[in-house]
């Protein structure tokens, strides 16, 4: 028996496939463009990030010491970032990060970049950070709120995550690294990297492979990914070519049903089981990027890069055994995106004031095709063809208006052209609806930013900003938009029509840097119109009544001695409906309170280093529970430990995650018809991982 309605079950399937069928990472860009804009307001003072915005940086050293096994969990140590995982384990597949409380649609409202190039695509699939070789990451920059929309465009609503990768430029002539590991659920993984450097030429390669049986039945994962580049670097000119690719196969175990009305609780009786033993999701991605940087005059650089990326996805959903034909569905989709992003960086005085300008043009051309059939071998019921072209121009400038005060402003205008069509075959097995109406649409949107920072002294800084952003509907949301049936259950054609989501936010806070102590805290508020969400009553995607986010985020660190570093953070996140039938209710899948703490203790001259982290999150509403009538996903906490060390060129680590074996789940989807009935995706208890390797 299904735990939720068929449409809601399809909603859960879509989320599962969207989270795991995600974009392979794009190629690194030039070193000059690989950070969020750097503003040099005097010769002796520089800071990173967008002026007035809340920005956090996770370094390569932080990543190396983190007990967490996935990049998503490492990022979730940043206040204001939540993580939702469908499958747990120690590989990170099926996990998504959420900046500032967007729940099930977090991936569409968090923009992910690789070296300043956007990865978010035309479909609902989020960026699968587990496909990025961990050793290839130099740092991760997180900017929260709307301000990133000026430089990077749509999806930058909750914030921007910029992953900066390593290169071989400036390094030793030859450098190599190998690592192998094994752990819980028969996990086996290995990685290799190499970098060559000779005069102006350099190259690098990072590759990783992983296999695991997974925590649950039908939850095995097999994944391979690699990235390589060649660079030429001279004083006034540099160029690069990068090729990357990944391949993943993942079993989809589905949810565990709980229904007190019939005495059913699979979380207790069969937590690791599956009701969907045949469901799967596969993904293959190939990406090529090339570009150059040319110094035009002192302080001015022309940066031009472009690329093409291909993503193929296949997923099959067959339901429980014995398989029933009405439960069967198969999807085979392909997406190709071409991009060209020339920009100009100018760092010169303007009317005697230090000035930093970044201006440019972004062009993206994406083509999507998806065959939707009952089985892989049968004729497609629907063939969806969508193409989307965006052309944008932007300008952002930061001025040192006083010796201790910086002001920034910027704007972006973006034209989006969409062409969407559906070919429906009524004779195909499983056909029961009708063909969607075609849609051709042109739309212009804009984003704005204004920010201010003032340094009272070397210790205390205040900052504030206001911004606006937008998010265009993606292809999966358009396919599932509008009613499929009328009141008499007669099929009606879809329209692909959804309104563009818009938002406006403000933020203010302070930073402290006093010797070994550092802290940052901010308050923010965000109002959204036409937020795109799934309606659990009408069973299709729609634009919501106006919604709101507000809260606070605080982080701090203290080095109490050379070997010991303490760190921690706390965030209060409110995501609520501000109008309509659900006014005052929480947006599902958003915890109001999250907190973390950690310690790094160098016990013995890097031969033995102890790292420990604790992460807490409060209860949250289940997906589908906008009406706030169902049980909450319970609050919980996990403790992770890691012992690591290095001697000469050899290194090792032992990690224990979820030390106290907490039994929890991040995601559940509620029934809209039966009180107390839901499907949950249980996560693993205590897990282990042992790794060892060497450098050459």
Regions found by a protein language model. Name each.
Residues 117-146, 163:
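Short acidic/polar hinge/loop motifs at secondary-structure boundaries
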